[in-house]
């Protein structure tokens, strides 16, 4: 009787416990509390495994947990309150804010996210403690801890955040470059003729990056690359052009309405080709590419230029084929069949030499094309060409050289108002900070690696080329508020990159520690600016302009004694223009 009574008591207690578990599953004190339904669902389900008897009772318990927490779990994963989604949305909102407010906004997002990470770590510790207190068997305890770790330390959004944090370490430097309107990566060029034997590519318009470059938007820059033993088809262009050879050797021939000019070209040779002149080229070398930077000043559309090919097949076509036969036959005094043969060509011959802008040529043909060519010297009396590197460097010492040809000195450049320059920096050397008073320089990296640092006012972001009047007024007001505030623009430079230095923006170029840096540049002027007397003003080095200030001006400007100003700005009496980073580090 006593045994039966005891059994009844045990049975009643078990039923009561099961009923209480089913009714209070949602109130089970899980490891995270009310703000984590997914975890509470896991706690509830695991409790069903521990405290229920029989498979049916366990299934009923788990169904109750699922009905209370399972749906919430799925909703939570797609709700914007999810930490990772909330962080991403926060960052996205920051990107839409003004540039000056963006860093503070991003910092707030990061701080909030880090607080949630700390909370997650605390919850993991609580979960782990719960496992040690509730689980008795070692295998269950290990399983419990493993589930805690998966929930709080190895979840996907935490791993994404860690990867994002690694990216943010380099984002500060890369962000300037990615949003830098003055740095044109070599991929900024668009190929017009990309063929087996060569490539002709054009840089995007300068003002497409930012309105501050509108002053030089009438110029376009292109790069012509011809493979060894390659001929470039004759063509003329609706633009005034300057050819600047940066690599290889070849022959450049062009015909004006009066004369034929032919030049042997090597790095440093500058050739001025008037608009409408028919020009063709040949790469004389058997191994190296002939690479030429071509500056265009269009005469029709200031934003666009076109090439016209008298001979061609498909791409490019001969522009003569656009005329009707009723015009061509009497104009050339020839039969229609001969015209078909001329413009169609022999199929086998076309297949052998190619059909594009660039044609493979024999060495005999290349030599014949260069027989009448002359080699430009410094000025050499040539009407249209000279070699920039044959003249005396404007600045030079053991760390570098700078060559320059200005419109007032070279008649080849006077009517187009362009300065041509070349910079050679030895490894580990610096072209000291300076600025140009009138010229905006477009610099092309020809060889080596390095970087550029430039001081820029805080400029508004470019929204569109044609801006609304209201946007312009807002930008003008913002510029006035930020007057006298600057930011550093730093860009890594490698072969093929373009960097634009606006007039009066202080700038410095630095060669890498293990490579020389070789660059060429075009100094461009706004059409309303007289290019004469552009001044390059140095702010460091032996001839920096601060040395010439009055003592009182130095003291009032810097707020220290003029002696200290002189000590700093006169501290490099032997070096001008170029200095070595190695020597400065050795003195430290």
Curated annotation (Swiss-Prot):
Feature: compositional bias, Acidic residues: 163-175, 465-478
InterPro entries, sorted: Cupin_1, RmlC-like_jellyroll, RmlC_Cupin_sf, Seed_Storage-Functional, Vicilin_N
Subcellular location: Vacuole, Aleurone grain; Vacuole
Protein name according to UniProt: Vicilin C72
Family, as annotated: Belongs to the 7S seed storage protein family.
Keywords from the UniProt entry: Seed storage protein, Signal, Storage protein, Vacuole
Purpose of the protein: Seed storage protein.
One annotated GO molecular function: nutrient reservoir activity
Region spans: Disordered: 159-183, 460-487
């Amino acid at each position: 009787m006593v045994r039966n009574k005891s059994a009844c008591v045990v049975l009643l207690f078990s039923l009561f416990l099961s009923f209480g578990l089913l009714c209070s599953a949602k109130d089970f004190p899980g490891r995270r509390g009310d703000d984590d339904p997914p975890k509470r669902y896991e706690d509830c389900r695991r409790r069903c495994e521990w405290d229920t008897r029989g498979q049916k009772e366990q299934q009923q318990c788990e169904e109750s947990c699922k009905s209370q927490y399972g749906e919430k779990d799925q909703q939570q994963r797609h709700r914007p309150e999810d930490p990772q989604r909330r962080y991403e949305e926060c960052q996205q909102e920051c990107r839409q804010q003004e540039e000056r407010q963006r860093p503070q906004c991003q910092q707030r997002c990061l701080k909030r996210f880090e607080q949630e990470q700390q909370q997650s770590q605390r919850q993991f510790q609580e979960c782990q403690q719960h496992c040690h207190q509730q689980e008795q068997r070692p295998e269950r305890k290990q399983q419990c801890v493993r589930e805690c770790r998966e929930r709080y330390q190895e979840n996907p959004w935490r791993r994404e955040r860690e990867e994002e944090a690694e990216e943010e370490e380099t984002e500060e430097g890369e962000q300037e470059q990615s949003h830098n309107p003055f740095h044109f990566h070599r991929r900024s060029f668009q190929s017009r003729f990309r063929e087996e034997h060569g490539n002709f590519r054009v840089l995007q318009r300068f003002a497409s990056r930012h309105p501050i470059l509108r002053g030089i938007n009438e110029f376009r820059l292109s790069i012509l690359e011809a493979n060894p033993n390659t001929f470039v088809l004759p063509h003329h262009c609706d633009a005034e052009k300057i050819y600047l050879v940066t690599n290889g050797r070849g022959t450049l021939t062009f015909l004006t309405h009066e004369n034929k000019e032919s030049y042997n070209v090597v790095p440093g040779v500058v050739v001025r080709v008037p608009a409408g002149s028919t020009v063709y080229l040949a790469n004389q070398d058997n191994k190296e590419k002939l690479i030429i930077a071509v500056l265009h000043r269009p005469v029709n559309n200031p934003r666009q230029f076109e090439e016209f090919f008298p001979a061609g097949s498909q791409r490019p076509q001969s522009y003569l084929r656009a005329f009707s036969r009723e015009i061509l036959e009497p104009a050339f005094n020839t039969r229609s069949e001969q015209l078909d043969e001329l413009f169609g060509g022999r199929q086998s011959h076309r297949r052998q030499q190619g059909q594009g802008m660039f044609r493979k040529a024999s060495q005999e043909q290349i030599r014949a094309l260069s027989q009448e060519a002359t080699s430009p010297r410094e000025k050499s009396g040539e009407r249209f060409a000279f070699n920039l590197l044959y003249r005396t460097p404007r600045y030079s010492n053991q760390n570098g050289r700078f060559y320059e040809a200005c419109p007032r000195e070279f008649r080849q450049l006077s009517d187009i108002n362009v300065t041509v320059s070349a910079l050679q920096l030895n490894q580990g050397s610096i072209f000291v900070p300076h600025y140009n008073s009138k010229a905006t320089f477009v610099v092309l990296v020809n060889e080596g690696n390095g970087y550029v640092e430039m001081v820029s006012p805080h400029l508004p972001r470019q929204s569109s080329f044609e801006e609304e009047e209201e946007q312009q007024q807002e930008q003008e007001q913002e510029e006035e508020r930020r007057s006298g505030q600057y930011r550093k623009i730093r860009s890594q430079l490698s072969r093929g990159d373009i960097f634009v230095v606006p007039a009066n923006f202080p700038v410095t170029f630095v060669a890498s520690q293990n490579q020389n840096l070789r660059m060429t540049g075009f100094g461009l002027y706004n059409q309303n600016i007289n290019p004469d007397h552009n001044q390059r003003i140095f702010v460091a080095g032996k001839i920096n302009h601060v040395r010439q200030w009055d003592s009182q001006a130095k003291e009032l400007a810097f707020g220290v004694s003029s002696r200290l100003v002189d000590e700093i700005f006169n501290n490099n009496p032997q070096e001008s223009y170029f200095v070595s980073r190695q020597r400065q580090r050795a003195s430290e």
